[in-house]
C-alpha cells in the first residue's frame, strides 16, 4: 500500500514535468522552422491505389516523408524528401533501449476535396510530453504541425476519398546516439510518414470484437509510462494479443490492480454506457491516472457527450466486479473502444476467468456508438464546419 501511494504521488508531482529530470539543452526554446523547409520531389513516384482497391492499415506509403535531424548543437533544417529507408548506426539508442516515441493522426478528404486534419493540436501536445519523458529534444508544436501540413499538401493526391478512408499520419521521434551507454542522447531523428488507409478492423466500423481479460498480463502501472505514446509500450503487447487470438478473441482487455480495473482495449481507450448502480444513465471511461493513454478520440467522445447533456459523463475507475454486477442486473447498454485507427469499436464479448461474458452492445443498436460515429464522420469529412478540423 505504501509503495502504491508513493507511486501515485510521484506520478502526480513529477511525471507532469519530466523535463526537470533531463538536461536543460533539450528544452530550450530553439526549434526547427517551417519557413526553412527544404523540398526534394521524388523522381520515381509510386503507383497509387486505384478506386475500390483495399487499403490495408499501414501497408501502403506515399511518395514523400518529412525528416529533421537533431544534435546537441540544435535542430537541422526540416526537409521533405522521397520516401526512403533510414540509415542508423548499429548502436543507435533507439534500437537498443527503446528511446523512441510516435504519434498517430488522420487527415480526411471531404466532398469539397478539402483535406483536413482532425484535432492535430492534441497530438502535438502529446508528442511533446512523450519527448520530455524520454529526454528527447523539444520542438515547437506549431512549427512541426506546419511542416506536416506541407508534407500532406505535397502528397495530397494520395488522400483517399472513399467512405471510411483517410490518410494516416505517423510522426516519429527517436534517439540516435551511436553508443551502447544508457544515457540522454546527443543525437535524435524526427520523421513523418503517411499511409492511405481504410477501416482498421475487417468488416467495417460496426463489427463488434471480443476481448480476452486476463489479470496475469499488465500493460501499464502508476508511476510507469503507460500514459505516453512510446514504442516500448507496444512491443510487449504482441504476445498477449497472440494469446487472445488463440483463445478465440480479437483483442485484449487490459486489467490493472488487485480489483482488476478496466484500463484499455488493445490500443484503444474503453467506454461503458450503462445505468449506474445509483440509477443514473451514464457514460464512463477510466480516468487519466498515469495508466491510461490520453486518446484524442477519447477526449472527443467525452466532449461530444458533454455537449449533448443527455446523460452523465464521468471519468472514473471501473472494476470487473462492477461490470459483472451490472451485467447480471441488466444495466449495461454498450461497451466500446475508441482510437485514431478504429474511431469507435463495439465490444460484444469478454472472456474473463474462463467465463464468456455477453455484452449486449449490438442488441442496443448500438445506439450511442452509431451516434458517435455519425457525429465524427460529419466533422471529419467536412459535412459540417467544426473548430476541431485543421485545413491542409
Swiss-Prot record:
InterPro entries attached to this UniProt entry: Aminotrans_IV (IPR001544), Aminotrans_IV_CS (IPR018300), Aminotransferase-like (IPR036038), B_amino_transII (IPR005786), BCAT-like_C (IPR043132), BCAT-like_N (IPR043131), BCAT_family (IPR033939)
UniProtKB keywords: Acetylation, Amino-acid biosynthesis, Aminotransferase, Branched-chain amino acid biosynthesis, Lipid metabolism, Mitochondrion, Pyridoxal phosphate, Transferase, Transit peptide
Keyword field contains Lipoprotein: no
GO MF term (any one): L-isoleucine-2-oxoglutarate transaminase activity
Catalytic activity: L-leucine + 2-oxoglutarate = 4-methyl-2-oxopentanoate + L-glutamate; L-isoleucine + 2-oxoglutarate = (S)-3-methyl-2-oxopentanoate + L-glutamate; L-valine + 2-oxoglutarate = 3-methyl-2-oxobutanoate + L-glutamate
Binding site for substrate: 168
Signal sequence extent: none
Modified residue annotations for N6-(pyridoxal phosphate)lysine: 229
Gene Ontology annotations for the cellular component aspect, listed alphabetically: mitochondrion
Any one Gene Ontology BP term: L-valine biosynthetic process
E.C. code: 2.6.1.42
Transit peptide range per the UniProt entry: 1-27
Enzyme class: transferase
Cofactor: pyridoxal 5'-phosphate
Presence of the UniProt keyword DNA repair in the record: no
Subcellular localization, as worded in the UniProt entry: Mitochondrion
Disulfide bonds: none
Family membership noted in the UniProt record: Belongs to the class-IV pyridoxal-phosphate-dependent aminotransferase family.
Function: Catalyzes the first reaction in the catabolism of the essential branched chain amino acids leucine, isoleucine, and valine. May also function as a transporter of branched chain alpha-keto acids.
PANTHER family registered for this protein in UniProt: BRANCHED-CHAIN-AMINO-ACID AMINOTRANSFERASE, MITOCHONDRIAL (PTHR11825:SF39), SUBGROUP IIII AMINOTRANSFERASE (PTHR11825)
Subunit structure, as described in the record: Homodimer.
Protein name (record): Branched-chain-amino-acid aminotransferase, mitochondrial
Organism, as annotated: Pongo abelii (Sumatran orangutan)
Amino acid at each position: 500500500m505504501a509503495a502504491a501511494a508513493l507511486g501515485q504521488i510521484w506520478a502526480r508531482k513529477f511525471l507532469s514535468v519530466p523535463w526537470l529530470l533531463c538536461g536543460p539543452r533539450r528544452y530550450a526554446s530553439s526549434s526547427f522552422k517551417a519557413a526553412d523547409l527544404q523540398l526534394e520531389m521524388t523522381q520515381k513516384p509510386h503507383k497509387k491505389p486505384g478506386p475500390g482497391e483495399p487499403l490495408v492499415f499501414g501497408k501502403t506509403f506515399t511518395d514523400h516523408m518529412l525528416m529533421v535531424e537533431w544534435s546537441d548543437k540544435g535542430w537541422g533544417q526540416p526537409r521533405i524528401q522521397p520516401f526512403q529507408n533510414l540509415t542508423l548506426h548499429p548502436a543507435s539508442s533507439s534500437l537498443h533501449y527503446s528511446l523512441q516515441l510516435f504519434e498517430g493522426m488522420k487527415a480526411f478528404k471531404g466532398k469539397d476535396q478539402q483535406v483536413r486534419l482532425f484535432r492535430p493540436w492534441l497530438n502535438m501536445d502529446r508528442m511533446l510530453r512523450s519527448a520530455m519523458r524520454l529526454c528527447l529534444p523539444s520542438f515547437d508544436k506549431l512549427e512541426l504541425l506546419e511542416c506536416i501540413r506541407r508534407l500532406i499538401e505535397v502528397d495530397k493526391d494520395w488522400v483517399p476519398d472513399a467512405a471510411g478512408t483517410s490518410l494516416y499520419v505517423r510522426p516519429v521521434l527517436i534517439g540516435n546516439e551511436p553508443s551502447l551507454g544508457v544515457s540522454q542522447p546527443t543525437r535524435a531523428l524526427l520523421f513523418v510518414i503517411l499511409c492511405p488507409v481504410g477501416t482498421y478492423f475487417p468488416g467495417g466500423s460496426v463489427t463488434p470484437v471480443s476481448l480476452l481479460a486476463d489479470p496475469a498480463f499488465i500493460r501499464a502501472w502508476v508511476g510507469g509510462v503507460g500514459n505516453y505514446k512510446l514504442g516500448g509500450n507496444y512491443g510487449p503487447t504482441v504476445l498477449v494479443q497472440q494469446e487472445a487470438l488463440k483463445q478465440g478473441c480479437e483483442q485484449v482487455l487490459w486489467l490493472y490492480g488487485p480489483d482488476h480495473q478496466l484500463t484499455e482495449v488493445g490500443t484503444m481507450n474503453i467506454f461503458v454506457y450503462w445505468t449506474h448502480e445509483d440509477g443514473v444513465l451514464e457514460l464512463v471511461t477510466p480516468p487519466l491516472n498515469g495508466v491510461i493513454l490520453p486518446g484524442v478520440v477519447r477526449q472527443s467522445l467525452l466532449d461530444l457527450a458533454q455537449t449533448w447533456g443527455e446523460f452523465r459523463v464521468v471519468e472514473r475507475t471501473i472494476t470487473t466486479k462492477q461490470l459483472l454486477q451490472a451485467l447480471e442486473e441488466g444495466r449495461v447498454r454498450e461497451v466500446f473502444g475508441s482510437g485514431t485507427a478504429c474511431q469507435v469499436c463495439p465490444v460484444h464479448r469478454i472472456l474473463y476467468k474462463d467465463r464468456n461474458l455477453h455484452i449486449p452492445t449490438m442488441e442496443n443498436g448500438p445506439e450511442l456508438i452509431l451516434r458517435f460515429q455519425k457525429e465524427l464522420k460529419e466533422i471529419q469529412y467536412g459535412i459540417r464546419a467544426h473548430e476541431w478540423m485543421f485545413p491542409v
